[in-house]
Amino acid sequence: MSGLGIMVLTLLLLVFMETSHQDAGEKQAMQRDAINVRRRRSITRRVSEACEESCEDEEKHCCHENNGVYTCLRYCWG
């Protein structure tokens, strides 16, 4: 095999080794993100049907109900 062929094979080997290290880092990051997603809790809101129905007209969610006053928002936080 010529010197040029050996250099090309060496270069390909180095490129392969570098890309495999990068993939391992991405895999670790994906696993870490998956663990964080599993730890999150979902908040279940309990409001009356009247509140839900009044907010449906505005295409929003009933986030809070206080003495018959409904808080309708696109997204409920906290």
Curated annotation (Swiss-Prot):
The modification Tryptophan amide is found at residue 77. Pfam families: Conotoxin. It is found in: Secreted. The keyword Cell membrane does not apply. Belongs to the conotoxin O3 superfamily. This is Conotoxin PnMSGL-01. It comes from Conus pennaceus (Feathered cone). GO terms for molecular function: ion channel inhibitor activity; toxin activity. GO terms for cellular component: extracellular region. Residues 1-19 form the signal peptide. Expressed by the venom duct. Disulfide bonds join 51-63, 55-72, 62-76.
